[in-house]
Amino acid sequence: MKVRCFCVVLLVSGTLCLHADRSYPGNSVPVTLNVQSR
C-alpha cells in the first residue's frame, strides 16, 4: 500500500512539474508561489 501511494505521489508531482515548466519556461519555482503573487 505504501509503495502504491508513493508511486502516485511521484506521478502527480511529475505532472505538476511538467505543467509548471510549460507555463513558466526557465522557472522551476512552484506554480503556487506565482499564482499567489498575482
UniProtKB/Swiss-Prot annotation:
Principal subcellular localisation of the protein: membrane
Annotated keywords: Cell inner membrane, Cell membrane, Membrane, Toxin-antitoxin system, Transmembrane
Localization of this protein: Cell inner membrane
Primary role: Toxic component of a probable type I toxin-antitoxin (TA) system. Neutralized by sRNA antitoxin TimR which binds to the 5' UTR of timP mRNA and inhibits translation. When TimP is expressed from its promoter in the absence of antitoxin leads to mild cell stress; overexpression in situ is toxic to the cell and causes membrane leakage. The antitoxin gene is encoded immediately upstream and transcribed divergently from the toxin gene; antitoxin RNA is less stable than timP mRNA.
Protein name: Toxic protein TimP
Membrane topology category: Single-pass membrane protein
Family: Belongs to the TimP toxin family.
TM regions (residue ranges): 1-20
Entry keyword annotation includes tRNA-binding: no
Superkingdom as given in the UniProt entry: Bacteria
Induction behaviour: Expressed under many growth conditions, up-regulated in macrophages.
Cellular component, GO, one term: plasma membrane
Effect of disrupting the coding gene: No changes in biofilm formation, persister cell formation or bacteriophage resistance; no visible phenotype for a double timR-timP deletion. A timR deletion leads to mild envelope stress.
Classification of source organism: Bacteria, Pseudomonadati, Pseudomonadota, Gammaproteobacteria, Enterobacterales
